[in-house]
């Protein structure tokens, strides 16, 4: 598995859980001897939803809600089989979406 890299993208609504998960992945990869690049913060997606407060009229009275999706990118360069096994056994919180590309 030399001269390869593993690219890990993390997504979450809560940035504190996301940063803790990224730190767990980085220290797990470093403990197995792989070189780690990141975590690199990617742009935050902000979805804004506007609804009317009243049911029938008063269009000037609106309320806005937003959902922010925070993202991080981690590259693991020259991973060993030991690194891949350690990453597969890693327990991360339920609010974090993980996308791994080899």
Curated annotation (Swiss-Prot):
Q: Does the keyword Ribosomal protein apply?
A: yes
What keywords does the record list, in alphabetical order?
A: Ribonucleoprotein, Ribosomal protein
| Any one of the GO CC terms | ribosome
Which SUPFAM superfamilies does the record cross-reference, listed alphabetically?
A: Ribosomal protein S10
Any GO BP: translation
Q: Name one Pfam family in it.
A: Ribosomal_S10
Q: Which SMART domains match?
A: Ribosomal_S10
UniProt KW Glycoprotein keyword: no
Its domain of life?
Bacteria
The record ties this protein, via InterPro entries, to: Ribosomal_uS10, Ribosomal_uS10_CS, Ribosomal_uS10_dom, Ribosomal_uS10_dom_sf
Query: Which molecular function terms from Gene Ontology are attached?
Result: structural constituent of ribosome; tRNA binding
Task: Return the HAMAP family for the record.
Answer: Ribosomal_uS10
Query: Which function does this protein serve?
Result: Involved in the binding of tRNA to the ribosomes.
Against PANTHER family, the record matches this protein to: 30S RIBOSOMAL PROTEIN S10 FAMILY MEMBER
* Classification via NCBIfam families: PRK00596.1, rpsJ_bact
Similarity annotation: Belongs to the universal ribosomal protein uS10 family.
Q: How does it assemble?
A: Part of the 30S ribosomal subunit.
Kindly provide the name given to this protein in its UniProt entry: Small ribosomal subunit protein uS10
According to its UniProt entry, this protein's organism is: Clostridium perfringens (strain 13 / Type A)
Q: What is the lineage of its organism?
A: Bacteria, Bacillati, Bacillota, Clostridia, Eubacteriales
């Amino acid at each position: 598995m030399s001269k390869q890299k593993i690219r890990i993208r993390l997504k979450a609504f809560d940035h504190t859980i996301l940063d803790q998960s990224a730190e767990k992945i980085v220290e797990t990869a470093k403990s197995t001897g792989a070189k780690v690049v990141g975590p690199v913060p990617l742009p935050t997606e902000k979805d804004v939803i506007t609804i009317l407060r009243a049911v029938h009229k008063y269009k000037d009275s609106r309320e806005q809600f937003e959902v922010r999706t925070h993202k991080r990118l981690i590259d693991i360069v020259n991973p060993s089989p030991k690194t891949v096994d350690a990453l597969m056994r890693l327990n991360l919180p339920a609010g974090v979406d993980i996308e791994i590309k080899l």
